[in-house]
Amino acid sequence: MSVDVVAIIPARGGSTRIPRKNAKDFNGRPMISRPLEACKAIGTISHRVVSTDDEELARIARESGATTVIDRPAELATDTAGTAPVIKHAIEELGTDDDTLVMCLYPTATLTPHLVSEALELAREHPDKFVVSVGRHRSPHERSLERLEGDLMSLASTDHLLTRTQDLPQRYFDAGKLYVARASVWKARETMMDKPFVPFYLPDWAAVDIDEPDDWPIAEALHRVFVLESS
């Protein structure tokens, strides 16, 4: 396969905390449709792939612009299956060239085409490394609290008790939205972050987690303001 970019969306049918999350309505469209629609708007992404174990998701994916739907093996569709093995399985199924950029884009990645394009450009500048989407922690880790016995709490550490928060280092987290690297890099690695990687800094609205039911309306509101109403 000789294309500029292959976008692979891993979408399991099961979801423990938000049932049927990837098929759930998100501002009027199934969740999985959102990243597919963003990819369709980018000319260099000529192959939009969905790896799934679920017939309904496969149907929605095709209706939303997926060019290929891969039947994911049961052993790669468990709660404990990692992302890298799923993407490597898809790469093998597709016969993707080693030099092709492969982007893993999660169904909950409600990103604009502009953000996705920026991540791809960053990956082209760093052909031998992973590009990983990251968000910024809004509160310093040095001020984390921990529960004690009974009803009490304390600082997890008092090392920076008197340090001003603005003087503490900014920390980041893996946003779990997208990962990009050449196919050869995916094939050679067990995970995306076992070695130093190139961060792709997401704005706060794009890095919001969608793991609990209460996260859903917050993510929808942010998506309406920063994507739907600004386009």
Q: Whereabouts are the PLM-identified features?
A:
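N-terminal nucleotide-binding beta1-loop-alpha1 segment
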Residues: M1-P19
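Hydrophobic targeting segments
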Residues: D4-I9, I32, H47-V50
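Conserved SAM-binding loop
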Residues: K24-D25, V50, M103, V208
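A short, N-terminal amphipathic alpha-helix
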Residues: M31-H47, R59-S64
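Short active-site oxyanion
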Residues: T44-V49, F130, W205-A206
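Short phosphate-binding loop-to-helix
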Residues: V49, E56-V102, T110-L111, E118
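Conserved core of the sugar-phosphate nucleotidyltransferase
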Residues: P85, A109-P196
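Conserved alpha/beta core of the MobA/IspD/sugar-nucleotide pyrophosphorylase nucleotidyltransferase superfamily
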Residues: R171-S231
